[in-house]
Regions:
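Loop/turn-rich, solvent-exposed surfaces of beta-rich toroidal or solenoidal domains
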Residues: 264-286, 292, 297-339
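Conserved beta-propeller blade signature
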Residues: 36-40, 87-91, 144-147, 183-186, ...
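Repeated scaffold domains used in trafficking and secretory/extracellular systems
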Residues: 71-83, 129-142, 170-182, 209-219, ...
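Exposed beta-strand face motif in extracellular beta-rich ectodomains
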Residues: 2-6
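Conserved structural position at the C-terminal beta-strand
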Residues: 10-12
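A short beta-strand motif characteristic of beta-propeller blades
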Residues: 60-73, 117-128, 160-168, 199-207, ...
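C-terminal edge beta-strand
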Residues: 19-30
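Short glycine/acidic-enriched loop and turn motifs that connect beta-strands
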Residues: 43-47, 94-104, 152-154, 191, ...
């Protein structure tokens, strides 16, 4: 699977440790297979850095994929990942120093790597020292990297190393941003903030009239917007004009974003999936307006009691990915990642 390292370590009779490292190349597609999946682990604020998992189309798992390819680690409490132009941008909450001042040996707050080899291309830490617990990232190009934190959304020019807080972005929610029509869309209450290249002020706002839970790019280049409340709604919004194309009322679930920081809806063509951090997975067919409960993941593994962050659907295979943990305390170390197939009237487990 691409480029890696072979390590041989031994100890002599005097207790001295010897380590030999060889870089090796294995014929294959590396991490470029579009059927593969990356999963970002935040790690733990007090004990370990974040890490990246890669799962290939056969369900084989490579833990610590970034560390394997670089010999170094991602930042402390990694939060979000965005891939643009064969580059992977990974933002962490704490970078090299956690919230209580403990230092960590890692590559910093923002890491840029080749998305097909995972080889590190650039790292940033001091340049982003003004950020306060960053959580999400979206990228238009190297000079227009948008990072959401507790202050709002910042524009970062990685070529110049300059970060600027975007005026009018205060209150941007701890939720995934979407990129469509060459713009970034961030959530702030009932409004979408429209962020544009090179602009340090919010370009315009789109008022949906109801608390927004999630925004995601549709396969036709427009936007999916879910709204929580009673009734809950899902709308398709024109990414060029900001006008609603169609809005469906959803009565079966409330579409609440909950405590998850990811995108609470996930789309495959005109079908949208939602779990609400629970074990049941729902499908909303936007064309027909019908919502169906596909199944309960507890039927596959009852030992895992909590869904940790929202589900995600693979844009090519249509398979649904859900992460479940055994519980809090040290039980968070015991987890299962489910790969599921929508059979039309239920769920089929592909890999666990």
């Amino acid at each position: 699977m691409g480029l890696g390292e072979l390590r041989l370590q031994g100890t002599d009779e005097n207790g001295l440790v010897y380590l030999a490292i060889a870089r090796v190349s294995v014929k294959g597609s590396g991490f470029a297979d579009p059927a593969g999946v990356f999963i970002l682990n935040e790690g733990n604020m007090t004990t370990e850095n974040g890490s990246l998992i890669y799962i290939d189309k056969e369900g084989k798992v490579l833990d610590y994929a970034y560390r394997t390819m670089n010999g170094t680690e991602l930042g402390n409490v990694t939060q979000d990942i965005y891939i643009f132009n064969k580059k992977m941008y990974i933002i962490s909450q704490n970078g090299k120093t956690n919230a209580v001042g403990t230092g960590f040996d890692n590559d910093g707050m923002l890491v840029v790597a080749n998305s097909e080899t995972l080889v590190k291309e650039a790292t940033f830490n001091e340049e982003l020292s003004a950020l306060n617990w960053p959580t999400h990232i979206a990228v238009l190009d190297e000079k227009n990297i948008f990072i959401r934190d507790n202050y709002g959304v910042h524009l970062f020019d990685s070529e110049a190393g300059i970060e600027t807080l975007i005026e009018g972005s205060k209150g941007a929610g701890k939720l995934t941003m979407a990129v469509a029509d060459g713009k970034v869309f961030a959530i702030a209450g009932s409004k979408l903030l429209v962020l544009e290249k090179g602009k340090t002020t919010v370009g315009k706002t789109i008022d949906m009239g109801q608390q927004i839970a999630a925004v995601a790019k549709a396969n036709d280049g427009n936007l999916w917007v879910s709204m929580q409340g009673s009734p809950a709604k899902i709308a398709k919004v024109n990414s060029k004009t900001g006008e609603s194309i169609k809005t469906n009322v959803v009565t079966e679930v409330n579409l609440n974003a909950g405590a998850g920081a990811g995108c609470s809806i996930t789309a495959y063509q005109n079908k949208l999936y939602y779990s609400g951090l629970g074990s049941k997975i729902y499908r909303h067919d936007f064309e027909t307006g019908t919502t169906t409960m596909l199944g309960d993941v507890k039927e596959f593994n009852s030992e895992m009691t909590m869904t940790y962050n929202p589900i995600a659907v693979h844009p090519i295979t249509g398979h649904i990915y859900m992460n479940r943990i055994k519980g809090y305390g040290w039980n968070f170390l015991i987890n299962s990642i489910f790969e599921l197939e929508d059979t039309g009237n239920g769920l089929k487990i592909v890999h666990e």
